[in-house]
Regions:
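Short, structured motif recognition centered on aromatic/hydrophobic residues
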Residues: 10, 14-17, 27, 51, ...
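Short, charged/polar surface micro-motifs in flexible loops or helix N-caps
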Residues: 56-58, 68-69, 93
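Generic structural signal for individual residues within well-ordered alpha-helical segments
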Residues: 24, 39, 94-97
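Amphipathic alpha-helical segments
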Residues: 19-34, 100-103
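C-terminal "cap" of GNAT-fold acetyltransferases
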Residues: 41-57
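A cross-kingdom feature marking solvent-exposed beta-strand/loop segments within repeated
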Residues: 2-5, 9-11, 33-39, 43-45, ...
């Protein structure tokens, strides 16, 4: 089991969308949610936006593909627009990854990669997480 002090919150729910600008307009006009951060992650092949949900600290992450080879483009082709991932905020991604591997879970990366806002991220394979793509997010530290 992962110790409580390592897994501290739901960070965000990731939603795959074909067009980020259209999705931002929909979430603003329908739910009153606005982007608090946008970036392009070339390594992961996505343009993304984080939308705060009130003052909860949790976000909706909208993910649009940059090209046909990106994971998000493949997800959209297979499943259409919709929830792509559930992300947990962790305090030590290396410790959480080691614990999960000891329990037999497969992680997608050998070492964490750069995520949104210079966070460190890894993913638990859906077959080892009840059919859900679970993202582990260790926020960047303020320097």
């Amino acid at each position: 089991m992962i110790p409580k002090h390592l897994l501290i919150a739901i960070d965000h729910v990731g939603i795959a969308v074909p067009d980020l600008d259209d999705a931002l307009e929909f979430y603003a006009s329908t739910f009153g949610l606005h982007s608090i951060h946008e970036e392009v992650n070339e390594e992961q092949g996505v343009r993304e936006a984080m939308l705060a949900v009130g003052d909860s600290g949790q976000c909706i992450q909208l993910l649009a593909p940059l090209n046909e080879e990106s994971t998000i483009a493949k997800f959209l082709a297979r499943n259409g627009q919709g929830i792509q991932q559930l992300a947990y905020r962790v305090t030590d991604i290396d410790a959480v990854s080691a614990t999960l591997r000891e329990r037999g879970a497969r992680l997608l990366y050998d070492v964490p990669k750069r995520g949104t806002s210079n966070s460190r991220v890894n993913f638990v394979h859906p077959k080892d997480a009840g059919g859900v793509l679970v993202e582990l997010v260790e926020p960047a530290t303020a320097d």
